[in-house]
Amino acid sequence: MTGSDDRYNAGGRLRGSVYDAEMERLQEQLVLLQYWIQSQGLKVLVVFEGRGSAGKGGVIKRITERTSPRTVRIAALPRPTDRERTQWYFQRYVEHLPAGGEMVLLDRSWYNRSNVEWVMGFCTEDEHQEFLRSCPEFERMLVRSGIVVLKYWFSVSAEEQRRRFEARNDEPLKRWKLSDMDLAERELYVRYSMAKDTTFQYTDIKQAPWYVVPSDDKRAARLNCITHLLSQFDYEDVAPPRVELPEVRDIPYVRPPLHEQTFVPQVF
């Protein structure tokens, strides 16, 4: 959302100072949510999908910046191996599902099948149709087993995607982010729109609905997504109290000389 108030710059984007203050506040709440998930033994699965450069990685980074990787962990699966290609399609994702007291963030997910794989011709039409039939029931099964499933689709316009790809292309330190798949995705932007619309038609279910995050303004998108994520839980502050640090125990021991160790050069 943009507006004419002083939270936004002349281009209608959220100001950095507003973003920084709000992000700090939200990250504090994410830490509290983390403790609540642990204390209640909740199993939370958050799916992040969208086009290349839509901002999925950015929001995942901010969610995990202050939380414990033992409780809030990222699952970003590589391309399937030859063995995995012979398995039930959902099988390789199952081992990454959350146990009690965990939140798992899926940076792309089984929805590769109905999006990038279908667009690029990496799956057959029969495989695509079977996915659309079986995915809703798979997710209902997860929900029935006690897993909270949240699905976010980051939506970036063709114009903004082009700007972000060009920015990566112009910056040597970021050029590695611009892959051949990104170039193909750019060319097939309309076909990706078809894939997304079909995916929603079949998988936007009551038990695990899709939530669309407009992401042309990355800052606003991150804040909006995290705010919504927090709103899905009626959590309480169960953070542990401050502890008293023990004094170092006096144990008779003489350490070896420091000069016997190899130190890195003191450049700074």
Regions found by a protein language model. Name each.
Residues 1-268:
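Glycine-rich phosphate-binding loop of ATP-dependent small-molecule kinases
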